[in-house]
Curated annotation (Swiss-Prot):
Enzyme class: transferase
Family: Belongs to the pyruvate, phosphate/water dikinase regulatory protein family. PDRP subfamily.
Matches recorded under Pfam families: Kinase-PPPase (PF03618)
Full protein name: Putative pyruvate, phosphate dikinase regulatory protein
HAMAP family in the cross-refs: PDRP (MF_00921)
Keywords: Kinase, Nucleotide-binding, Serine/threonine-protein kinase, Transferase
MF-aspect GO terms: ADP binding; ATP binding; phosphotransferase activity, phosphate group as acceptor; protein serine/threonine kinase activity
Protein origin, superkingdom: Bacteria
Binding site for ADP: G147, V148, S149, R150, S151, S152, K153, T154
Amino acid sequence: MYHVYLLSDATGETVERVARAALTQFRDVDIRLRRMGQIRNREDILRALDEVDRAPGIIFYTLVNTELAQFVRNEVEARQLEAVDLITPLLYKLAEFLEMRPQKLPGLQYEMNSEYYRRMEAVDFTVKQDDGQEPRNLHKADIVLIGVSRSSKTPLSMYLAHKGYKVANVPIIQGIDPPGELEEVEPERVVGLIIDTQRLVDIRSARLRNLRQSPRGSYADYRQVEEELAYCRRFYRAHPAWLVIDVTNKSVEESAAEILSRLHGDIRHD
């Protein structure tokens, strides 16, 4: 059985309709929907996510309060859960199209100005450059993150993008050469991510369990992960001008702050 959790700050009818419409494309699958409405504060969110922890599944949520929506994003990242925000991207796009501020976003204080459009442009760029896509655009990135699978490249990229940085991320895979364009990027813009072996094994194992796959394969095997990280470190040592940070047990916010601090503000946007 697959669990789908529906979080809403109202009755939850809207998020359920969207979820059911999407699920019609997946027949003959045993799916349990769990609707959690009236999510009004952080305590409500924590109670809901504790339930998800006990029976992992995917979360769909519609929270018009942007502070609560951000709190959900932070928590699901920390807990290694899968979640989809169904309303915030839509509201941003409508606000951009209509040149109006949404009426029911009490936490949203942005103005429709060049700063807002620049940040949205950064997000669009970052999405298109995720996981090594379109390497020809690496030279356009403010920051290029590199690292092995599940080392926080994507969540870090998106967090930085929402701060206005154009970010690309490139996977480091043992036995496969990274794109040649990476060597052409100014070294002060490249950040290598490293992580503790056991921590990465735990993250990958949790990922496999969420996908209903066995964690016993090579992807989460301690020795294999150790070899991947050793290969990654050797690759970083061959590029001493690159910044390398350890993301072990750090939140996305902490890792992002370290990256921006250690880059000495050369590409500061805030």
